[in-house]
């Protein structure tokens, strides 16, 4: 993933000028080329953005994520049309969604194996690891016996403790997990739309009120990678801060061995979603699932702050750019 992720953390105005993003604060300004931007995270509820810029972001398939008062992602702005042959792809996707049971089986199995490996990497009880591997090996077509749910309970009880609940907002790490999952989900949705996929049409998730059912399917094997990263990041911390949010965005730039290449996790997401689109379009399965053991969580940060008086415009990008 060669482009940058832009975070807007303060009260600023975003506008379009000659195919550039312009960030204004008073009479101060920062300009950044749109063709170098992957995503913009609007992390301040008083920041504003012009209609012309919104239109251009959609045209260029640049993802815009908005957050709530707790700084958690709450919305994704993405193109209405993302592909020149979207109607043809839609037909293929509808047909595929009727017979995607084997793919969901593979996704669930990959997720549970990564959960087991996450516990193993953190030196948790080997008996629990073996139990999860057993769950993974016994997943049925379309996971009719719901091994995913059973495995998740065993996994989180071991990782976080038996009193842990993913729905409890008072547990600090839940906010960090929600933030990280939302960032990965947004990237999957962005790439999927660019491939002509309709994100409403899930393989397993079928919620009529969810615009991103497919993203919620495809994200599953990446969740344990997020869990491991966030677990290490938040260990011993008392607050979920702006610094943590930047570190979580940096997860997209951590290296992973994927399809024989040492690439960014963000680029692995691109290749992963493209492989799914190829399966739908051509009935050729080249999907490789991410392996948590192949991720390098090096202590690197590619964060550069552009100061506008007392305000900060944060750019998160690759080291070689």
What are the language-model segments listed below?
Residues 1-29:
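N-terminal, Lys/Arg-enriched amphipathic/low-complexity engagement segments
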Residues 2-5, 11-12, 59, 71-321:
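Active-site helix-to-loop segments that bind/position phosphate- or nucleotide-bearing substrates
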Residues 11-14, 19, 33-45:
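Structured surface patches comprising rigid loops and adjacent beta-strands/short helices at the edges
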Residues 13, 29-33, 54-56:
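Short secondary-structure boundary/capping segments within folded domains
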Residues 17-24, 63, 139-140, 173-174:
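Short low-complexity stretches enriched in small and charged residues
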Residues 31-34, 166-168:
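A short alpha-helix capping/helix-coil boundary motif
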Residues 36-85:
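Glycine/small-residue-rich interface belts in oligomeric ring/scaffold proteins
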């Amino acid at each position: 993933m060669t482009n940058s992720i832009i975070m807007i953390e303060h009260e600023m105005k975003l506008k379009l000028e000659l195919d550039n993003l312009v960030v204004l604060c008073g009479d101060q300004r920062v300009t950044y080329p749109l063709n170098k931007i992957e995503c913009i995270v609007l992390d301040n509820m008083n920041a504003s953005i012009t209609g012309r810029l919104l239109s251009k972001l959609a045209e260029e398939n640049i993802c815009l994520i908005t957050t709530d008062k707790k700084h958690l992602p709450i919305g994704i702005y993405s193109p209405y049309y993302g592909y020149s042959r979207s109607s043809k792809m839609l037909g293929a996707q509808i047909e595929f969604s009727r017979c995607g049971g084997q793919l969901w089986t593979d996704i669930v199995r990959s997720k549970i194996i990564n959960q087991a490996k996450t516990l193993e990497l953190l030196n948790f009880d080997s008996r629990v690891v073996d139990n999860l591997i057993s769950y993974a090996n016994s997943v049925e077509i379309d996971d009719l016996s719901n091994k995913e749910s059973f495995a998740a309970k065993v996994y989180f009880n071991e990782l976080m403790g038996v009193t842990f609940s993913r729905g409890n907002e008072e547990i600090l790490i839940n906010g960090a997990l929600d933030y990280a999952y939302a960032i990965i989900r947004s990237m999957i949705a962005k790439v999927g739309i660019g491939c002509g996929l309709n994100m409403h049409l899930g393989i397993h998730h079928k919620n009529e009120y969810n615009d991103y059912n497919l993203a919620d399917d495809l994200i599953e094997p990446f969740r344990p990678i997020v869990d491991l990263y966030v677990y290490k990041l938040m260990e011993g911390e008392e607050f979920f801060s702006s610094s943590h949010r930047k570190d979580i965005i940096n997860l997209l730039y951590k290296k992973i061995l994927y399809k024989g290449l040492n690439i960014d996790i963000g680029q692995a997401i691109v290749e992963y979603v493209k492989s799914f689109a190829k399966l739908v379009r051509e009935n050729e399965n080249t999907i490789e699932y991410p392996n948590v053991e192949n991720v390098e969580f090096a202590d690197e940060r590619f964060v550069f702050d552009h100061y506008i008086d007392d305000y900060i415009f944060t750019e998160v990008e690759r080291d070689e750019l």
